[in-house]
A protein has these predicted regions:
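Conserved Rossmann-like nucleotide-cofactor binding loop
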Residues: 67
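Accessory DNA-binding and partner-docking regions appended to nucleic-acid-acting proteins
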Residues: 1-4
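Helicase motor core with emphasis on the C-terminal RecA-like subdomain
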Residues: 6-11, 15-19, 23-35, 39-45, ...
Length: 306
């Protein structure tokens, strides 16, 4: 068994890689740029998490959502005895917490840091990272770079120019599950990774079943019947408005279906608590706006309703 597979088993509990993970990881470890386009559930996160633990220094991961960062940090910490191995740097932290994170990084305790793009643009963040030993840069949900993408974030377009100040020769891995050829070209151009290797696998998901139903006058009753026919199975229901989220979640609970709401109008502590309960199977259904879901790693979700 090679060193990578030993690390894989020790830190993630897997005996073998799947899909394109191994060549992607080897390419990154060898100091080459990578652009990774894999479907949801294709194992993108491991492509930077394992190299972060394998290489010297700290890996910087740019991630667009606080919920997504927290989910990934919790998963990495869950497989390691030392919680300081992974941290987040975003607006959810107090000044004292930020100083603790920086101390762990400076003392070499931390191997991977998830940073919000808005936090990255701050002068103090740039100054601190310029003095840190960085192994590589990972850009998760890289489609946020593109003005043509459905999740465009202006701060994502500044990542490359910021790292030109911090570490101009940094190795970059950009990852997405959703990018048209036009968006792919824009990502590559913006990050200046024209000489990198592109990894793309099939997006055919034979294990998924899609169904479109006409809405009846009894939509809520239909929902309750469907969920009850999938008793004790995890599911996500997406609504267009916060009001719909709250009303539907309340209705499900009245009908003895363990449900929690999630939307940007809720206090952050409540959002985090509801997400944790869903991930820990303390509720069956999360009712949410599109604020929830990008990158959430829950292997037993059995239905998604829009």
């Amino acid at each position: 068994m090679n060193n990578l597979k030993i690390k894989l088993k020790e830190n993630f509990g897997f005996s073998s890689f799947k899909n394109l993970q191994e060549p992607i990881i080897n390419n990154l470890i060898n100091g080459n740029h990578s652009f990774v386009i894999l479907p949801t559930g294709g194992g993108k996160s491991l492509c930077y998490q394992l190299p972060a633990l394998y290489l010297d220094g700290i890996a910087i991961v740019i991630s667009p959502l606080i919920a997504l960062m927290k989910n990934q940090v919790d998963l990495i910490r869950g497989n390691n005895s030392d919680e300081s191995i992974a941290h987040v740097l975003n607006s959810s932290l107090t000044k004292n917490q930020i100083e603790e994170v920086k101390s762990d990084i400076t003392n070499g305790k931390t191997k991977i840091v998830f940073i919000a793009p808005e936090t990255l643009t701050k002068k103090e963040t740039i100054a601190f990272l310029s003095k840190s030993s960085i192994s590589f840069l990972a850009i998760d949900e890289a489609h946020c770079i593109s003005e043509w993408g459905h999740d465009f974030r202006p701060e994502y377009r500044k990542i490359r120019e910021i790292f030109d100040q911090i570490k101009p020769d940094i190795t970059i891995i950009a990852l997405t599950a959703t990018a048209t050829p036009k968006v792919q070209d824009e990502i590559i151009k913006n990050l200046k990774i024209d000489n990198g290797k592109v990894y793309k696998s099939s997006f055919n998901r034979p294990n998924l079943y899609y169904e479109i139903r006409s809405k009846s006058n009894e939509t809520n009753l239909d929902l309750i019947k469907f969920i009850n026919s999938n008793k004790n199975k995890s599911g996500i229901i997406y609504c267009l408005s916060r009001k719909q989220v709250e009303e539907l979640s309340e209705l499900l609970n009245i009908n003895r279906i363990k449900s929690l709401p999630y939307h940007a109008g809720l206090d952050k502590k409540i959002r985090d608590k509801n997400q944790d309960k869903f991930l820990k199977d303390e509720c069956d259904v999360i009712v949410a706006t599109i604020a929830f879901g990008m990158g959430i790693d829950k292997p037993d979700v059995r239905f998604v309703i829009h």
